[in-house]
Amino acid sequence: MLELRHRGSCPGPREAVSPPHREGEAAGGDHETESTSDKETDIDDRYGDLDSRTDSDIPEIPPSSDRTPEILKKALSGLSSRWKNWWIRGILTLTMISLFFLIIYMGSFMLMLLVLGIQVKCFHEIITIGYRVYHSYDLPWFRTLSWYFLLCVNYFFYGETVADYFATFVQREEQLQFLIRYHRFISFALYLAGFCMFVLSLVKKHYRLQFYMFAWTHVTLLITVTQSHLVIQNLFEGMIWFLVPISSVICNDITAYLFGFFFGRTPLIKLSPKKTWEGFIGGFFSTVVFGFIAAYVLSKYQYFVCPVEYRSDVNSFVTECEPSELFQLQTYSLPPFLKAVLRQERVSLYPFQIHSIALSTFASLIGPFGGFFASGFKRAFKIKDFANTIPGHGGIMDRFDCQYLMATFVHVYITSFIRGPNPSKVLQQLLVLQPEQQLNIYKTLKTHLIEKGILQPTLKV
């Protein structure tokens, strides 16, 4: 897609470079001239946009207007641009953190809605960039199909979530049972309808560009929808698996900015000239310490550590359970060098605090590469930010570019090292079986438990 350029600078049908003559060809032959002309026409018809385009050929996107509130502009008018940006970023950061705490207080369902809203906004910002770059081509149905595919993919992923975590609710609603039973077929049929609409929308002079934008939409869906689905999966494991990773990325973003602002001297990467080694290293140590402390505080409360479950009897999400071993204090022997520093041989920790070190390390060492990736994308399209939704910060995608990598890592980490069989899910699957199947499973399980010595055999009189 980066090789396309604005329609106004594209060569006309007869401006394509002619193929070189073979040795021995008669330069003035009528037959050869006609053959060459036909070949050129055929090449031009099929390949109107040659692969010789460079990134500099991409039309520039007009800069977004400044959306900083007038009250802030007046209050900070006497400051230099550097300190003005500092105060704007700081005030908006504190505001967003306060709103985040409020949503946490409102419960897991509101957090899910927040994730869904952020996903839609990030998708909108990325798709809008493609539309603004190539809007002069007047591509048919591009925006309509993009949003249609977003709807289809969300229907597929969140339908899977409903089937997994809302089984008791679905069993009471006959209409929902049909949708869940044939969910994957319905999802596939919806996607096929969009696929056929795309094929029908193809226009001869825009074939290549339309396929570029088709790929653009699907990659955007992969980045936004898939990752947001994983975030919600992490949330169902317990709110702590949602809060510690996300807050670690936020902490790293803030502390790396602070260390870089005050102490930054050595550039870190060319993609982001303002990033420095001082900020990167300072952010790493700050994030590990923050994650360790946050894990200790949150591990004390059932509200944060219990898996999120939907209870049909109260028609709401509940976070009540007996905390697992991860969230129960354990005594550990310290290694020799720590014994000398702390002057004690043992320490009591929650096992989750040890896992938090791995999460914080990823957030501070690998997570920033999501931001570097986004910086490269923005440089390719000559834009400063994805949007101007948040003054001083850019778009929503500018704030969540690192979170998507983190979501995938946490999901892989949980499935690889933490998650075991879920009794609740097993029970839900048993409840939808036929009575004969349930009875057979009961007899098999009873026999197994008797052989293990857990149950006593029933005496026949």
UniProtKB/Swiss-Prot annotation:
EC numbers: 2.7.7.41
PROSITE patterns: CDS (PS01315)
Leading EC class: transferase
Entry GO terms, CC: endoplasmic reticulum; endoplasmic reticulum membrane; membrane
Pfam family, one: CTP_transf_1
Keywords: Endoplasmic reticulum, Lipid biosynthesis, Lipid metabolism, Magnesium, Membrane, Methylation, Nucleotidyltransferase, Phospholipid biosynthesis, Phospholipid metabolism, Phosphoprotein, Transferase, Transmembrane, Transmembrane helix
TM helices/strands, residue ranges: 96-116, 149-169, 183-203, 230-250, 279-299, 357-377
GO biological process: one example: positive regulation of fat cell differentiation
Cofactor(s) needed by this chain: Mg(2+)
Record annotation: effect of changing K204T: In a breast cancer sample; somatic mutation
Family: Belongs to the CDS family.
Job of this protein: Catalyzes the conversion of phosphatidic acid (PA) to CDP-diacylglycerol (CDP-DAG), an essential intermediate in the synthesis of phosphatidylglycerol, cardiolipin and phosphatidylinositol. Exhibits almost no acyl chain preference for PA, showing no discrimination for the sn-1/sn-2 acyl chain composition of PAs. Plays an important role in regulating the growth of lipid droplets which are storage organelles at the center of lipid and energy homeostasis. Positively regulates the differentiation and development of adipocytes.
Name of this chain's protein: Phosphatidate cytidylyltransferase 1
Gene from which this protein is expressed: CDS1
